[in-house]
Amino acid sequence: MTEAHEYKLARLGAESAAEFRAIRLEALETYPINFASAYEVECDWPLSAFEDRLKQWLHVGAYHNSVLVGVATLVPQIPARMKHKADITSVYVKPDYQGKGVAKAMFAWLEAEAAKEFDQVHLSVLAANDDACRLYEHLGYKAYGVEPRATKYQNQYYDDVFMVKFLK
């Protein structure tokens, strides 16, 4: 584990599936428009689906007093000519811990891991999520496009902003 302020950062593995499932479902329920998936879908998944997800990609967890308070994921791009890129996805910090450096610490951890293998990292963020957009800009991400009507929730459309940070 890596110390970051008062938070411990650690790679989440299959053994973390139960706590990962709990925080993931909390994220989907608390901020439904911020995620492409839905609570109603993932709440029915067996624990093994979360174990598989943890085995497939690089997930970082932020702990405070042994409680998982934040998560984020690094997903490599697969096509041969895109292997220099990875995506940071599924970023969530519990509301009581937002604005306290948790997301910043998780991004620093993921970017350090990504820099070992990738030249750049990408992310997409709900355009209406001003706090997240400001944070990502502060962390050095640059917007390069907007997808209009990227997601639809309760008959309302939401745009996504695409951002990139060059690591090399």
Task: Give residue spans per PLM region.
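Terminal substrate-recognition subdomain of acyl/acetyltransferases
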Residues: 2-6, 11-14, 159-168
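Acetyl-CoA-dependent GNAT
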Residues: 14-17, 21-22, 26-96, 107-109, ...
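Conserved active-site alpha-helix within GNAT-family acetyltransferase domains
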Residues: 100, 104, 128-146
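Conserved GNAT acetyl-CoA-binding A-motif
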Residues: 107, 114-125
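Conserved beta-strand-loop-alpha-helix junction that forms the acyl-donor binding cleft
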Residues: 123-133, 150-156
